[in-house]
Curated annotation (Swiss-Prot):
GO terms for biological process: cellular detoxification of fluoride. It catalyses: fluoride(in) = fluoride(out). The keyword Ion transport applies. This is Fluoride-specific ion channel FluC. The lineage of its organism: Bacteria, Pseudomonadati, Pseudomonadota, Alphaproteobacteria, Rhodobacterales. GO terms for molecular function: fluoride channel activity; metal ion binding. It comes from Jannaschia sp. (strain CCS1). The keyword Cell membrane applies. Keywords: Cell inner membrane, Cell membrane, Ion channel, Ion transport, Membrane, Metal-binding, Sodium, Transmembrane, Transmembrane helix, Transport.
Amino acid sequence: MLRVFGHGTVGGAFPLPILTVNVLGSFLMGVFVVAAAHRGLTHLSPLVMTGLLGGFTTFSAFSLETVTLYERGDVGQAALYVALSVGLSIAGLMAGLWLARGVFA
């Protein structure tokens, strides 16, 4: 997935590809939670949420990119990246829940 969006900060600029993947993964997790509950498929939650979506999102890459920015002296960008990653991932999850609840209502 990261090949589609490019590379992160290791030798580059702001880690937008990793941020995008993490927010998208959170959105998909929100959709899955509601869809699985609606369809009676909650038994698949560990497989999909931990396995599939856990492998899709990139928390270890998020950590590396944050430390790389910090060690490069880009403390402001590191703080912005952490704030955007956490805030937008939570917003993405909430948007997925909202969308799926609208579909399955």
